[in-house]
């Protein structure tokens, strides 16, 4: 009996001995995301805020671990209304929202315009940033993120990625249309910007990583868990500060005195921002400069959508004073079509899509039915090959437009292809150019707005009394051009289908600037009046060797023999390369420059 009881006791106690209590516990849960306060200090930012706020909406970070601190003042646009609507609609998503609007006054005392930074403005902005930083400290935030109100954060994981760098002050490198970015690699003994050899390799991402630099600005992340962060301040300036009264320099000095190193990270593309304008620029200039940043995003990325928590009016498109705007697109290149339609819409430009003739789909009987004959003796100048089917389709696409211009009696038309990027202030600069052409009663047939200048040894002749216009010399590409009714008539009158060559070789023949006399001899009437914008208003999205470069003209087959393919080593093709460097003697230095042109070419 005792043995039986002992046996049952073993059975009852055995399982308990085989399990430790901790083995029955669930695994430890993940840590909560660090608490982040995002600060926005905005003025006259109505043009940029819908997209900047949309980018913040889309950050891949739990909203309940984020606080939003927003201040705005001295506005002459509807910045306050936009921010208020957004905050009302998103406030329940965030852990905390602080809103500091100031409706009056709309200008600072002593400022000459909305882009003029007076000492009073610097001081006010620094005080607001300091207030935001103190709020973050009071609520025990782990991180403080400052974002300027025209900075587009396209990388949704930017917060996580900056946190992983484990730096007290770290900034994501932002892209711009120029060499400008949100960091300095050098600083003078007086605190000003200093050019250094280290800058461009980082800016171009030839060197990738997180680099110690003396200055970061615009968008940056502070790790408030670091002990040294307690000594950082946007305002007041450090007692030892004697440099210029400038917000970013004052903060950089604060970091230096706190022995905190600033870092810039360029491991990935994190976002975009516009190049700063001059103090005399207008709000319209600023809006169009920001618009250009949006367009640059779309060259290689999906468009930046505005915040869904804002009610926005649709844009009103127009034809910029032309009778028609033609946009050529291959039906199978839907990605290009969608990008171009969006970029045109953002610029409020209406267009008519012209379905391009697909050279690959042309057969011998179709070519024969059109009466197409090759120009005797033509061969590609770089490969020695005849015309490709892609080049044939390209020519026919432009040829069909010239026919439509004549049939409809269109006095002036803009023709653009689908693989281009627009220069800053594109619409205004083109409209200004055409107004000057009209007011000066220029006798013109065709005006390039995008091309590759092939004559690089001597300057082109500037057009008197017209800003930014030269007489066109030998050029490649038909990215974009303005053409008159008379110009289209001249091109058709030459009967080019009977002596076919690529369209960008045909045009220089028709304005008598082709270097090969034999080609020109087949076209006795070469009186096309051709000019070019200078500087150019559009450029290709990609060049030979670029990631994503696709050529529908070079990568094809010979026009009359599908078995002969033409996909040679495109690295050898000069035709699709970027514009060669012009010699100093060839620079069009006597061309009248408009203020917009000089602004567009600045690289700060």
Curated annotation (Swiss-Prot):
Region (Disordered), start-end ranges: 570-604
Coiled coil: none
Catalytic activity: (5R)-5-hydroxy-L-lysyl-[collagen] + UDP-alpha-D-galactose = (5R)-5-O-(beta-D-galactosyl)-5-hydroxy-L-lysyl-[collagen] + UDP + H(+)
A Pfam short name: Glyco_transf_25
A GO MF term: procollagen galactosyltransferase activity
Key words, A-Z: Endoplasmic reticulum, Glycoprotein, Glycosyltransferase, Signal, Transferase
Subcellular location(s) of the protein: Endoplasmic reticulum lumen
InterPro entries: Collagen_mod_GT25 (IPR050757), Glyco_trans_25 (IPR002654), Nucleotide-diphossugar_trans (IPR029044)
Major subcellular location class: endoplasmic reticulum
EC number: 2.4.1.50
Sequence motif Prevents secretion from ER, location on chain: 601-604
Annotated Polar residues bias: 584-597
GO terms under cellular component: endoplasmic reticulum lumen
Sites carrying sugar chains: 78, 166, 363, 561
Biased composition (Basic and acidic residues): 570-580
BP terms from Gene Ontology: positive regulation of collagen fibril organization
Signal peptide: 1-18
Role summary: Beta-galactosyltransferase that transfers beta-galactose to hydroxylysine residues of type I collagen. By acting on collagen glycosylation, facilitates the formation of collagen triple helix.
Family (UniProt): Belongs to the glycosyltransferase 25 family.
Name recorded for this polypeptide: Procollagen galactosyltransferase 1
Organism: Danio rerio (Zebrafish)
The organism's taxonomic lineage, starting at the top: Eukaryota, Metazoa, Chordata, Craniata, Vertebrata
């Amino acid at each position: 009996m005792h043995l039986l009881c002992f046996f049952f006791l073993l059975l009852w106690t055995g399982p308990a001995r085989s399990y430790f209590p901790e083995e029955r516990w669930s695994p430890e849960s993940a840590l909560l995301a660090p608490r982040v306060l995002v600060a926005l200090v905005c003025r006259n930012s109505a043009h940029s805020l819908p997209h900047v706020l949309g980018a913040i909406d889309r950050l891949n970070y739990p909203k309940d671990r984020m606080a939003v601190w927003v201040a705005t003042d001295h506005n002459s646009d509807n910045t306050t209304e936009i921010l208020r609507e957004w905050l009302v609609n998103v406030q329940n998503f965030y852990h905390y929202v602080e809103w500091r609007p100031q409706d009056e006054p709309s200008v600072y005392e002593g400022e000459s315009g909305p882009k003029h930074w007076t000492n009073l403005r610097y001081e006010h902005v620094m005080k607001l940033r300091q207030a935001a930083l103190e709020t973050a400290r009071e609520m025990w935030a782990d991180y403080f993120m400052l974002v300027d109100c025209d900075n587009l954060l396209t990388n949704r994981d930017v917060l996580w990625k900056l946190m992983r760098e484990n730096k007290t002050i770290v900034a994501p490198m932002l892209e711009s249309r120029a060499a400008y970015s949100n960091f300095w690699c050098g600083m003078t003994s007086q605190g000003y910007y200093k050019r250094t050899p280290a800058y461009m390799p980082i800016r171009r991402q030839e060197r990738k990583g997180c680099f110690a630099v003396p200055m970061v600005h615009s968008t940056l992340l502070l790790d408030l868990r670091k002990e040294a962060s307690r000594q950082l301040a946007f305002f007041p300036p450090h007692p030892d500060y004697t440099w210029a009264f400038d917000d970013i320099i004052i903060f950089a000095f604060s970091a230096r005195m706190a022995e905190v190193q600033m870092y810039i990270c360029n491991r990935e593309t994190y976002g975009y921002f516009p190049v700063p304008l001059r103090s005399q620029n207008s709000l319209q200039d600023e809006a169009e400069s920001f618009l250009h940043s949006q367009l640059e995003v779309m060259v290689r990325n999906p468009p930046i959508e505005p915040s869904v928590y804002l009610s926005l009016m649709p844009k009103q498109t127009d034809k910029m004073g032309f009778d028609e705007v033609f946009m050529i697109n291959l039906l199978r290149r839907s990605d290009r079509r969608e990008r171009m339609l969006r970029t045109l819409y953002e610029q409020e430009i209406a267009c008519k899509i012209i379905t391009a003739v697909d050279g690959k789909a042309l057969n011998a009987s179709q070519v024969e039915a059109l009466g197409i004959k090759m120009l005797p003796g033509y061969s590609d100048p770089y490969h020695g090959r005849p015309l490709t089917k892609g080049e044939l389709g390209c020519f026919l696409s432009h040829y069909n437009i010239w026919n439509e211009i004549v049939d409809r009696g269109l006095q002036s038309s803009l023709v653009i292809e689908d693989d281009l990027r627009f220069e800053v202030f594109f619409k205004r600069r083109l409209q200004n150019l055409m107004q000057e052409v009209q007011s000066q009663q220029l006798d013109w047939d065709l005006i390039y707005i995008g091309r590759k200048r092939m004559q690089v040894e001597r300057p082109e002749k500037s057009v008197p009394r017209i800003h930014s216009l030269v007489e066109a010399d030998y050029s490649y590409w038909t990215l974009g051009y303005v053409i008159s009714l008379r110009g289209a008539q001249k091109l058709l009158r030459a009967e080019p289908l009977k002596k076919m060559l690529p369209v960008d070789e045909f045009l220089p023949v028709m304005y008598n600037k082709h270097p090969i006399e034999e080609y020109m001899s087949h076209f006795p009437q070469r009186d096309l009046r051709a000019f070019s914008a200078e500087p150019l208003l559009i450029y290709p999205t990609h060049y030979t060797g670029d990631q994503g470069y696709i050529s529908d003209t070079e990568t094809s087959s010979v026009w009359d023999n599908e078995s002969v393919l033409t996909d040679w080593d495109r690295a050898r093709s000069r035709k699709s390369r970027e514009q060669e460097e012009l010699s100093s003697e060839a620079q069009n230095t006597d061309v009248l420059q408009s203020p917009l042109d000089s602004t567009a070419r600045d690289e700060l």
